[in-house]
């Protein structure tokens, strides 16, 4: 290839320098016999100019080189390489030197050189030529690849020192006998890689470390040379297509890990430092080299190839990979690829580690290598075939790789807008993931840190991430390594670069911003080997929280350490103090941590400092998580804030937290306030001159950062007291026990809280012995209603140990009932009912269960009581109660019923919810005397029923009622009927002699007498009226009977008249009166009237005609009988 084409690829190169072994020239002769090699040479000579213009994908080009490592021919040639002699290597080096001399511009290489290069460097040369990166690749490969390039330069020094130690190459040969042009070529390559990584950040590399390859050669052997070359060519052709698909999938994972690039500056500085050391070993590195790209193929290490081990973000394997065989590595690599979790980086590292092992074992003969090669070839070929079939681009499974969340199209993901991701990380629809898919990805897509379950990560509380970004365990290990470097500066000068490679940090993690909290000195921490650290981290982190197994066996006497409050000093300033055995301190700025072990016979520091350092560092970072459920055996800590102090908290046998204040008073000299160690039966007396750790003698160890600014090594010999920073403990012995541990606001006055605590502790001294841990006495309960200034402190859940979280009604501490409290159980309610007799439901036999307003026994009304409804009790005022409005008022003197919790009305007859009662209760508590509103009702009227003391009434046990309503004795007497009305009234007046001096009562009695008299008069009038009404009713009945008789008579007369009229009509039918028609029923009345007039006025009818008419009428009427 001409120089112009080479110069075009100058600024984009692979991250590894090619190493051409000493037998390169001899191998070229054997490569000419390979038909594929000859065909590639012919194609390459025709495509020299087009190749310089085309910009292929860097991943595809890198894969061509990558699988030279996995090919069996390359591995076999490396085994054969060490058998070649030093003299032959030096002779070959001279030939390489001649080939690598600078040529003039536009001068083509000789045909022999072109044949040699094209036969042996078919794919490497293509890669070097085609690595012009496209613009999208520039954004992807940036500072992360810069670190990899620097690490390669550092590791190149490891190989050189290994050769010197084994005797294969003398130091004089390394320093003096190297050709000047070859050494200048390597120096130029290293310098360009470092400079271009910093300036342009476009160093192109494969997905993992596949370009970190050995280009090895072997001596010309009569048996197997040509077949091995053919295998190498065929494997390269076969695996090239497979790895393209595989790399495309792994490219997606790199997108998730790009956010870690800017967090790896510390590691970059270390690698650059090692690179400078490597450059110092080359005295002639300043010589010019006009062809750096071409000379990159001719490295000045004739018999040793560069072995690279780079840990990436997806590497979860330890250094134990170097102990496995090549066959096992191939099997495990395929298994990892099928799971879709590990990329090619683990494969390359494992294979390189195995090759290092083979190179360092010169006792193995060439014949054994040939046998192993033939066996590995047969075993690896089926694996390659399976790889090809699995990652075939034409298969539908390849195209269907997308987010496993059902219904997710890739939008809204944290890692970007694309549907082809294969993990649950960053998916906004993770709540819709079925348990089967979640379980399938739980063991595959998780944090690569050994022992990490995903909890405590900075970015999220999930176990599906596949990077070490934000991993607290990895961060703890990084802190430990940095402490080791600063605490043991002498060991670093003695250790070789090989040991630095082995102890390379397993991850690039985020730096904890601890220095902002004050004077943080990491050189106090000890050195912890990574093997022990990983083992301890895995031991302490694999415990899962099973809510189903929440019982007294696991959580009994579990300790909680509240957060340490600040005092005179700044709350953010602290220093880390070392332990006596150089254990790593806890670097969390504001929290204390306790490690509880299940063993009760272990001493305070009975485990090694490595385990302690690993656990304390991991615990410190895990507690930085926003949501981290502590494990039951290793992280039994929980942070709680108090305004001025912290309380001693304990979990009893029932699994409930105990925040009561009436216990452990006599142990105040044993336990400091900042930590709870109540599971330990005995403790040493705390040192009173310094802040100390509370170390349990039997079950727990606790470390905590604090605000002290000075520390001595001998201060750690005894337990440390954190209770009184910068002052003596004897000054304030009463402040050990706070009022209650809650999330109260800092607005509460500290002095007022201390006074309340002291008052309460004085009242509770009589309740200390033989008490249930969750006791709530009347005094304790009524302290919830103290001053308005401490409103947020007092309005908390009355359940002992409840901080308000987990309630059905919400996560707040301001509720004042047990309703919805997850920690309130039946035994606790019964216990509270036993100690608060006046805070019960007034219904007889009601324990408070089944109420509409909640299942608790602290209610004091019949509202919602199911038993009150069943028994038919009425809570409405009766007639006698309504007569006197004074009976409907609050019994507390001076209360008008306003401001009551239960409502703004005056009809209640108890002190429940009365603000005046609460205020006087507070005054009584501050004065040292218990307050009871019943004492205000001893004077006054009592029940008027003889022998009744007020008990057993339906409306409550009160002495203030002045009526017979609800009195069981009065109702019993009324049912028997033994007391008449007059006797009852007389008894009423007799029992009212106590109130004779009351003018109001006298006036009422007088009015009652007047009413009685008027009632008597009205009753007499009513009797008279009733008699009159009776008389009138009798008269009315008589009249009605007479009317009936008359009606009957009238009816008989009408019948008779009808008969007469008919007879008259028949008789006078033939007689016609003048000027009248014959008689009929229609004119009967007129005919009768005319006849009557004729007989009345007979004088007018004296003429003969009229006389004859009258005679005829008389004759006709004679026959009619009336």
UniProtKB/Swiss-Prot annotation:
Binding site for Zn(2+) 4: 841, 846, 859, 865
Positions bound to Zn(2+) 1: 403, 408, 421, 427
Major location category of this protein: nucleus
Biased composition (Basic and acidic residues): 118-131, 225-243, 290-300, 310-322
BP-aspect Gene Ontology terms: cell differentiation; nervous system development; regulation of transcription by RNA polymerase II
Zn finger spans (CCHHC-type): 394-437, 438-481, 788-831, 832-875, 881-924, 934-977
Chain positions recorded as Zn(2+) 5 binding sites: 890, 895, 908, 914
Region (Disordered): 1-139, 208-334, 479-499, 566-595, 634-770
Signal peptide positions on this chain: none
Gene3D superfamilies: 4.10.320.30
Residues that bind Zn(2+) 3: 797, 802, 815, 821
UniProt binding sites for Zn(2+) 2: 447, 452, 465, 471
Example GO molecular function: DNA-binding transcription factor activity, RNA polymerase II-specific
Binding-site residues for Zn(2+) 6, renumbered to this chain: 943, 948, 961, 967
Biased composition (Acidic residues): 86-100, 244-273
One Pfam family recorded for the sequence: MYT1
Domain of life: Eukaryota
InterPro entries: Myelin_TF (IPR013681), Znf_C2H2C (IPR002515), Znf_C2H2C_sf (IPR036060)
Stretches with biased composition (Polar residues): 487-499, 634-646, 690-711
Family: Belongs to the MYT1 family.
Function according to Swiss-Prot or TrEMBL: Transcriptional activator which is essential for neuronal differentiation. Can promote ectotopic neuronal differentiation and confers insensitivity to lateral inhibition, but only in cooperation with bHLH transcription factors.
Protein name, per record: Myelin transcription factor 1
Origin species: Xenopus laevis (African clawed frog)
